[in-house]
């Protein structure tokens, strides 16, 4: 898998974190640099760690399912992509919760970062099947998610919900396209 494909996957994976970062920014009373950086570090860090965990798990089963690995990659990426598109229609960005400094604490940020990075775990499994070099992949995923999360907080403080659903739809379409590409490369 090349740099361009990894970058597309990284952008697609970061869309859940981007949408959550928009929500964080939307609900912030002030644009605090400290909280913006916290969001970027948590989301970028978890988006880098989860594919590594998935990769480690995937390598344990790689030999036993190598004849169908392209189907597994296609199915996982398609399911994740379809789910992202479906979730884009939900208005799950509520400011009823406390978005003071306490909502940027370890517990709250860990739970939110974990929730937005579950998809990356499944992608890590597909990386193992495709024999992707994991170190550069997780570096790219983490860095892009960090940057897009910071941008998301800024967008949230300025524009609000306008871009959240569009970002999730784009991420879903990218993942489905990458899954189809992987499948077609193995079938043709």
UniProtKB/Swiss-Prot annotation:
Annotated compartments: Cell membrane
UniProt keywords, alphabetically: Cell membrane, Ion transport, Manganese, Membrane, Transmembrane, Transmembrane helix, Transport
Primary location recorded for the protein, binned into one broad class: membrane
InterPro entries: Mntp/YtaF (IPR003810), Put_MntP (IPR022929)
GO molecular function, one term: manganese ion transmembrane transporter activity
Tagged with keyword Membrane: yes
Cellular compartments per GO CC: plasma membrane
Entry similarity comment: Belongs to the MntP (TC 9.B.29) family.
Stated name of the protein: Putative manganese efflux pump MntP
Biological source species: Alkaliphilus oremlandii (strain OhILAs) (Clostridium oremlandii (strain OhILAs))
